[in-house]
């Protein structure tokens, strides 16, 4: 059995978790939810797309080296990755942002973490109450686009926040058949969990997202929600991700062009990780 926290590919998922006073959290939440979130969704996406396109410019490749020096302990961090498909080098910062592993991690566990980042929320589905979003009362099922009661109450809900420094491709946590793909339009409010002290998963209830269900060999559904945030030019699914298609554990499910969080409702519970710890792609779930 793999010990907790093994970094088989040394992905370095760690970043500073800010502890801010309540008044500042309230201010940031107001700016994110009320001011920015009050703008029409199309305007939010247009501004985010413009912001994202800036990082596609060739001059932004010169950001990569100082960015690595600032955020990563390994000065050769970039050497562990490949540029996106069809490119031979990192020609822009966006290319680095959507980098690919040269070698995917190897795990003997039947289920793994699908992404890299901070596990900012975790617990049984029935332990979560309701959230009020634009005068609507919403439950955990709202995130995944299903009706209340569709997800077994003993399932485990997790939310992993991906910092800008994190690897931004989402992988299958288990082998199985894709039994649902759903796109939910929405806002693009700020994702950083420390500004939503009592409800770090609030953005997942209202932001644009793709929901993907994977049914494993025991007939159990693993619910995934790939949630966008400000600056997201787009969320893309590989052409191989199709309804009724089969995926192997760690097959790629989606990638983000800047900013994201990944929620999951699973029949299994994490063995080695708990709220406010860091997880890595391929680490034992």
Language-model features: locations:
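Contiguous, well-folded functional domains in the mature portion of proteins
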Residues: 1-285
């Amino acid at each position: 059995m793999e010990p907790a926290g093994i970094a088989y590919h040394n992905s370095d998922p760690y970043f500073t978790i800010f502890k801010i006073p309540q008044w500042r959290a309230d201010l940031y939440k107001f700016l994110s939810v009320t001011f920015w979130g009050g703008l029409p969704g199309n305007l939010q996406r247009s501004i985010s797309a413009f912001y994202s396109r800036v990082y596609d410019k060739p001059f932004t490749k010169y950001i990569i080296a100082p960015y690595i020096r600032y955020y990563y302990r390994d000065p050769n961090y970039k050497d562990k990755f490949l540029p996106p498909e069809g490119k031979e080098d990192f020609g822009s910062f966006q290319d680095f942002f959507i980098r690919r592993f040269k070698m995917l991690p190897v795990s003997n566990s039947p289920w793994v973490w699908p992404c890299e980042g901070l596990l900012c929320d975790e617990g049984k589905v029935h332990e979560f109450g309701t959230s009020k979003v634009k005068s609507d009362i919403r439950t955990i099922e709202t995130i995944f686009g299903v009706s209340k009661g569709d997800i077994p109450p003993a399932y485990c809900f997790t939310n992993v926040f991906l910092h800008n420094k994190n690897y931004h491709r989402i992988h299958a946590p288990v082998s199985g058949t894709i039994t649902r793909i759903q796109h939910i339009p929405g806002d693009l409010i700020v994702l950083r969990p420390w500004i939503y002290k009592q409800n770090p998963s609030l953005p997942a209830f209202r932001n644009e997202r793709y929901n993907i269900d994977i049914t494993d060999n025991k007939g159990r559904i693993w619910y995934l929600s790939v949630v966008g945030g400000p600056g997201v030019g787009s969320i893309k699914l590989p052409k191989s991700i199709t309804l009724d298609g089969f995926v192997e554990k760690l097959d790629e499910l989606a990638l983000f062009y800047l900013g994201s969080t990944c929620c999951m409702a699973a029949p299994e519970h994490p063995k080695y990780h708990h709220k406010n710890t860091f997880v890595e792609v391929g680490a034992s779930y």
